[in-house]
From Swiss-Prot:
Primary localisation category: virion
GO cellular component terms listed in the entry, alphabetical order: virion component
Keywords annotated in UniProt: Coiled coil, Virion
Basic and acidic residues composition-biased segments: 1-11
Region spans: Disordered: 1-26
Protein name: Putative core protein L410
Coiled-coil regions, chain positions: 112-140
Polar residues biased stretches: 15-25
Organism field: Acanthamoeba polyphaga mimivirus (APMV)
UniProt subcellular location: Virion
One matching Pfam family: Pox_P4B
Entry annotated with the keyword Nucleotide-binding: no
Superkingdom classification of source: Viruses
Length: 661
């Protein structure tokens, strides 16, 4: 019998496990995609929609997350293409230099309002326009990637390519040394270990509603919780409210996913990862968590992000006490540093503002776009003072003034840059003080590091991506003359009680609604980080007995305010769709929940909740509260508020395609 050459045997695949699994996977993916298409036809994706999908496909979490991200990426890719067309049109119109960039952006804010663009859409236009600027026009953008002088180590390590090219092609991948391969493997291992955690955080964020009832009704249990091991109020003020830009950059995006894609020379098509990639490669601070190695810097940032994921999950489930989670977060964040680029005069502060700056620097989140110009021409002014005969005025006549009369020497140079937060300086004297309006910080003078020199510059805000973050330094250093004749022993009391650092209670007017002059952008107050003041001194003999005579408590018979901690003030704005007809105000004070409080009628003691309702304006008299001070929401914000977070009610995500004009 002849051999059956070329004959292909057939096999029964009905029992093939791999084939069945593949078929089931495709079937589930098709169902998820069909359900997502139905939802997107409505025009929005709500937490209720996310909850419905999660209940239906909870066991297929990996497929669900992947489909949602792909759906979002397709939509944003279309927006990016439209933004590029518009940017090219504007570039061609104004490339002759007749109009500076900050005036172009201000003009486009009017179109933003008229065409109802979202912050996401406007920001894509700004990115595309700035990427087109070359030559002298590129100097208008601080740290423009088109400048040859821009040498971002993070950018080089990740391949040194632009955001646009990441979408279109896979190139040479990471550019790291052989000695750094071990760090890369650590990052990839961290990604594998935390993949399920990230998917859980992502789905939980989609389902989470602003100031969820679960998040604000947690309890303190003395048998299970240690009151001092509470989650930092700074994180509560960022993540109990739902603010899109924090969700996208810190929860949706994944440092590990970016590194994995670049190491495998694959495209980055995940929209949150693309936004994070753009920010970390265009950040003027460059490395922030490790000076010697950019890939080690990214590993440290990834550690902060992983620790943050765990804390947010606990916080939003009403668990405000976890020493292990906070210890991990604090250790990883402390490895990162403050920078000299933003508010150089505050670079060595170690307070609430420093923590916030470090956290924002980890994610290179710089939402506020500002225009700066020198207060005056320092170089020409100094030259005029030292050698006025060399400063020539009109018609070759030496100028008798300090500055040159040459308009090209003294013409202010406008620069567009981005900052993480806005600093408002307050006076140290609080007696009979007139409140300063927080809005005055939108146009002010600040100190910046330019070419390794700290100089003053006048800044004004062009616009801000969804959030406006203000910072006030509430810690004031006061030295009493009597401490020189009777010095204080630092081994006897904590540093915060050393008489050098106390609360600066200068009043600040805090509006619940803030409108920027350019573009009429509206921001609502969402949360305030407030420092806690403890009154010491003026105590009874029994309490002071045993303390050294040269200590504060031994010296002072008068009450002294000492900063001993911080709390969070959170507001939930009105929302007629969810049945919130008036704003609600909350106090996040997990440590205070452990302290017994005497009942006003002297009938006993009670304890407050970790998160409790607080009146917005009315502060009851101490006579009515049994001698207990209970300031209102805005009283606390005015006197002790240090970080103020405002957000746009419409969020950051795009709602409709970008309109061309």
């Amino acid at each position: 019998m002849a051999d059956n050459k070329g004959r292909r045997d057939t096999f029964d695949v009905s029992g093939d496990t791999n084939t069945n699994a593949t078929s089931n996977k495709r079937s589930i993916e098709d169902k998820i995609e069909a359900d997502l298409d139905k939802i997107m036809k409505k025009g929005s994706f709500t937490p209720a929609d996310a909850l419905e999908l999660y209940n239906k496909y909870g066991d297929e979490n990996e497929y669900l997350v992947d489909k949602i991200l792909k759906m979002n990426s397709k939509k944003n890719l279309k927006i990016r293409k439209q933004a590029r067309l518009l940017a090219e049109k504007i570039y061609q119109r104004y490339n002759n230099g007749t109009k500076p960039l900050h005036e172009i952006l201000e003009k486009m804010l009017k179109y933003k309002k008229e065409n109802k663009w979202s912050d996401k859409e406007y920001d894509e236009f700004r990115k595309e326009l700035t990427n087109l600027l070359t030559g002298n026009r590129a100097l208008e953008i601080d740290y423009n990637q088109n400048l040859t002088s821009y040498k971002s180590r993070i950018n080089r390590a990740l391949g040194g390519i632009k955001n646009e090219e990441v979408i279109r092609q896979a190139d040479s991948g990471l550019r790291i040394k052989d000695s750094e391969k071990g760090v890369l493997q650590d990052i990839l291992n961290m990604y594998d270990r935390t993949a399920n955690l990230h998917r859980t955080v992502f789905m939980h964020s989609l389902m989470y509603e602003d100031c969820s009832l679960v998040a604000i009704t947690g309890e303190f249990d003395r048998k299970r919780h240690l009151a001092t091991n509470y989650i930092d109020p700074i994180l509560a003020c960022m993540f109990i409210p739902k603010i899109d830009i924090f969700e996208i950059h810190m929860l949706y995006a994944n440092f590990g996913s970016i590194i994995k894609a670049r190491s495998e020379r694959k495209q980055i098509t995940n929209e949150p990862d693309l936004l994070l990639y753009y920010d970390i490669t265009s950040d003027p601070n460059d490395v922030v968590c490790e000076i010697n190695s950019p890939i080690a810097d990214l590993r440290n940032r990834y550690r902060v992000q992983i620790a943050l994921w765990g804390i947010v999950m606990k916080l939003r489930n009403g668990n405000y006490y976890d020493s292990e989670a906070m210890d991990d977060f604090s250790k990883t964040l402390d490895a990162c540093r403050n920078n000299l680029y933003d508010n150089a005069d505050l670079a060595y502060n170690n307070d609430e503002g420093a923590i916030m700056r470090r956290l924002l620097s980890v994610f290179s989140l710089r939402p506020t776009i500002i225009v700066t110009k020198p207060v005056y021409s320092i170089a020409s002014f100094a030259m005029g003072q030292l050698m006025p005969q060399l400063i020539m005025g009109a018609n070759g006549v030496p100028s008798p003034f300090g500055q040159s009369m040459n308009p090209f020497n003294n013409q202010p140079i406008y620069t567009i840059t981005s900052i993480p937060m806005i600093t408002l300086q307050i006076p140290p004297i609080t007696d009979n003080a007139e409140p300063i309006d927080l809005r005055s910080a939108t146009t002010q003078t600040l100190w910046v590091n330019e070419n390794k020199t700290i100089i003053p510059k006048e800044q004004s805000i062009i616009y801000s991506k969804e959030v406006l973050i203000f910072y006030i330094n509430r810690r004031i250093q006061r030295i009493q003359l009597k401490t020189f004749s009777n010095p204080l022993s630092f081994s006897q009391l904590p540093l915060t009680m050393s008489s050098f650092e106390r609360l600066n209670g200068y009043p600040v007017h805090v509006p619940d609604r803030l409108v920027l002059d350019r573009g009429d952008e509206v921001y609502n107050l969402r949360s305030v980080v407030s420092v806690t003041e403890t009154k010491i001194g003026g105590l009874s003999t029994s309490l002071v007995e045993g303390l050294p005579s040269n200590s504060i408590l031994g010296q002072n018979s008068q009450s002294t305010g000492i900063i001993t901690g911080r709390t969070g003030l959170i507001t939930k704005p009105r929302n007629f769709e969810t049945g919130v007809f008036e704003p609600e105000y909350y106090l996040y004070d997990p440590f205070g929940a452990s302290l017994p409080v005497r009942h006003p009628d002297q009938s006993g003691y009670f304890t407050n909740k970790p998160i409790s309702h607080i009146p917005p304006l009315y502060s009851p008299s101490v006579d009515l509260t049994g001698g207990i001070e209970n300031p209102s929401f805005f009283d606390r914000a005015s006197r002790t508020g240090t970080i103020f977070i405002y957000a746009k009610p419409q969020g950051y995500n795009p709602n409709q395609p970008l309109s061309l004009f």
